[in-house]
Curated annotation (Swiss-Prot):
This is 2-C-methyl-D-erythritol 2,4-cyclodiphosphate synthase. Pathway: Isoprenoid biosynthesis; isopentenyl diphosphate biosynthesis via DXP pathway; isopentenyl diphosphate from 1-deoxy-D-xylulose 5-phosphate: step 4/6. Involved in the biosynthesis of isopentenyl diphosphate (IPP) and dimethylallyl diphosphate (DMAPP), two major building blocks of isoprenoid compounds. Catalyzes the conversion of 4-diphosphocytidyl-2-C-methyl-D-erythritol 2-phosphate (CDP-ME2P) to 2-C-methyl-D-erythritol 2,4-cyclodiphosphate (ME-CPP) with a corresponding release of cytidine 5-monophosphate (CMP). The gene is ispF. InterPro entries: MECDP_synthase, MECDP_synthase_CS, MECDP_synthase_sf. The record marks 34, 133 as: Transition state stabilizer. Pfam families: YgbB (PF02542). It comes from Clostridium novyi (strain NT). It catalyses: 4-CDP-2-C-methyl-D-erythritol 2-phosphate = 2-C-methyl-D-erythritol 2,4-cyclic diphosphate + CMP. One of its GO terms (molecular function) is 2-C-methyl-D-erythritol 2,4-cyclodiphosphate synthase activity.
Length: 157
């Protein structure tokens, strides 16, 4: 068995959609980034790639490549799932946390789990998503950005 850890952070800004776990969340600010800036999916991808010793998302989907500009991170997650399969790994479980002062994530978590499980061709009970705040502390607590952490367990087939 192999374990992987991922982390991502993006700045909140105007005139962008807020996409987390492939879900568009109604909010006056969105995340700034080359792709759709889905910090949850980016952290999950990095944890999976790390567990398989396949590098990180910057290696596979560089922000210097215009073909990834504005791309849905869910499409990239599917590619990561294919990479794991091609390298004879199966996902045991994923556990991730979204760190954001606002908006509240609870109404969207079930749909995020469905999206992630579907993209990776795994069962929903293999994916856990949580959300927390930093009690007004730091850049996420001040509402300047959103971050996410992910840990996963994979196994050779």
């Amino acid at each position: 068995m192999r374990i992987g850890m991922g982390y991502d952070v993006h700045k909140l800004c105007e005139n962008r959609k807020l996409i987390l776990g492939g879900i568009e969340i109604p909010y006056e600010l969105g995340l700034l980034g080359h792709s759709d800036a889905d910090v949850l999916i980016h952290a999950i991808m990095d944890s999976l790639l790390g567990a398989a010793a396949l590098g990180d998302i910057g290696k596979h989907f560089p922000d210097t490549d215009n073909k990834y500009k504005g791309i849905s991170s869910m499409l990239l997650l599917k590619e990561v799932g294919k990479l794991l399969n091609e390298n004879s790994y199966e996902i045991i479980n994923i556990d991730a946390t979204i760190i954001a002062q606002k908006p509240k994530m609870a109404p969207y978590i079930k749909d995020m789990i469905k999206n992630i499980a579907s993209a990776l061709c795994i069962n929903e009970n293999q994916v856990n998503i949580k959300a927390t705040t930093e009690e007004g502390l730091g850049f996420t607590g001040e509402g300047l950005g959103i971050s996410s952490q992910s840990i996963c367990l994979i196994n050779e087939k």
